[in-house]
Amino acid sequence: MTSFWHRHSRHAITFFLLLPALLCFFGLFFYPMLLTVVLSFRPEGQEVGWTLGNYAKFLADPDGRWVILLTFILAVGSTLFSVLLSVPLSLILRAKVRGHRFYRLMVLVPLVIPGLIGALGLLLFWGIRGWFNLFLTQFVPFVTGPLRVNYTIQGLILFYVWLYFPYTCVTTMSSLESLDSAIEEAGAVSGANRWQVLRYIVLPLITPGILAGSILTFMAAFGAFSVPLIAGGDYRPLAVEIYKEISIPIPGHWSSASAIAMIMGALQVGFLTLYMRFVRRGGGTGGAR
């Protein structure tokens, strides 16, 4: 009897310790997701009913398809530029250049600063009367006028790169630091020059780190909200489109917004599934000390 009570009391204690986390999970994640799914199939403005019209309306609308394409353009473009920036920067910082600790700290700054504050700062920097255009018009002779960066697709990609490239940079630096230097030395002894060691040894071995950072950057950029909301102008990706459907009409189009949210989630899950399948099939190799 004592052992029975002791065994079940431990289970009860474990359950009560997990109960707050379970309540938070069901209340803050599971229930809202379930409600979103239900609303996405409910006719707009009705309490009951079932329809695919919310999905069909958005996907059949050229503006809806453009929003999806724009979201992919911003996410893919910012991911590519983040990789192009992160790999050389990681290689430089790996060499322990003077002040490398400070530079590593600066890499993490975009992760610390809230996206809204960062976007406002970038709007001021790239603005018509911002420091960037002030420098161009004052010191670059062939520039006759300010360049328009804000409220453009190119400007949004620049904003995304500044905010999200630390994901790629941190994972790439981590892969480089875990790389066994003996492998590079063996390549050099075999007659390979520095470029060949980098091209045929280092880059293939750090590919998993680059891919991991890339998927983090892509997912963050794909779901970005605050930055395109204030810096996107007429360019509205999926997250902003969802907000527009809820906030601008009175009453809000909750069913349409829920359908767009489900489409957005399905695209993210689909991309993540393709990425995981690519990794399982040997999309990258790694080496560690």
Task: Indicate residue ranges for each PLM-predicted region.
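Glycine/proline-centered hinge or cleavage motifs at structural transition points of membrane proteins
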Residues: S190-G191, P204
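Glycine-rich helix-loop "coupling/hinge" segments at transmembrane-helix boundaries
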Residues: P43-E47, F225-G252
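Short, Lys/Arg-rich, polar N-terminal cytosolic tail immediately upstream
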Residues: M1-S9
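Short cytosolic juxtamembrane segments of multi-pass membrane proteins
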Residues: F278-R289
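Membrane-water interface segments at the C-terminal ends of transmembrane alpha-helices
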Residues: R10-E44, P62-P146, Y151-T152, L156-L176, ...
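Transmembrane helix boundary and interhelical loop/hinge segments in multi-pass membrane proteins
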Residues: V48-T51, I128-R129, S175-E185, R194-Q196, ...
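A short amphipathic helical element positioned immediately N-terminal to and/or at the very start
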Residues: F4, W50-L59
